[in-house]
């Protein structure tokens, strides 16, 4: 997904969010494997394949209590594009765009603290995954 800065279909600038997320994860020293491949689409067109990602994000808006709608991303969790095992993940909430990098950092830190990669940790402790995500939705 090339994002809303170029694509006329885009609702959110997925490339900008990706750059901020990568920077935050690197600055937090999240080890390789603590997070899966993350797919970010700026709209519902799914150019990144966010529905079939272990963690995917789809550009949208989210109401701010007592205010105007703010840039946000719907969160998809648990999808797979593996041959013979492909399936869509579940939509589990919406995170404000500005909080998306922090969400990924916290998920990566939790998997790393458990001494496991994302796949092992998220399968072994889905309640921890959901608890972290609940703070952001």
Language-model regions, residue ranges each:
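Peripheral terminal and linker regions in Fe-S/redox and tRNA-modifying enzymes
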Residues: 1-137
């Amino acid at each position: 997904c090339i994002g809303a800065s170029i694509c006329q279909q885009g609702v959110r600038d997925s490339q900008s969010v990706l750059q901020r997320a990568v920077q935050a994860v690197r600055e937090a020293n999240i080890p390789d494997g603590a997070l899966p491949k993350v797919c970010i689409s700026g709209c519902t067109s799914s150019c990144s394949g966010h529905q079939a990602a272990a963690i995917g994000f789809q550009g949208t808006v989210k109401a701010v209590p007592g205010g105007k709608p703010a840039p946000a991303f719907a969160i998809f969790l648990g999808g797979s594009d593996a041959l013979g095992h492909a399936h869509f993940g579940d939509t589990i909430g919406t995170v404000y765009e500005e909080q998306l990098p922090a969400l990924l950092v916290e998920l990566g830190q939790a998997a790393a603290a458990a001494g496991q990669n994302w796949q092992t940790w998220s399968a072994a402790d889905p309640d921890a995954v959901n608890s972290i995500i609940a703070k952001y939705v």
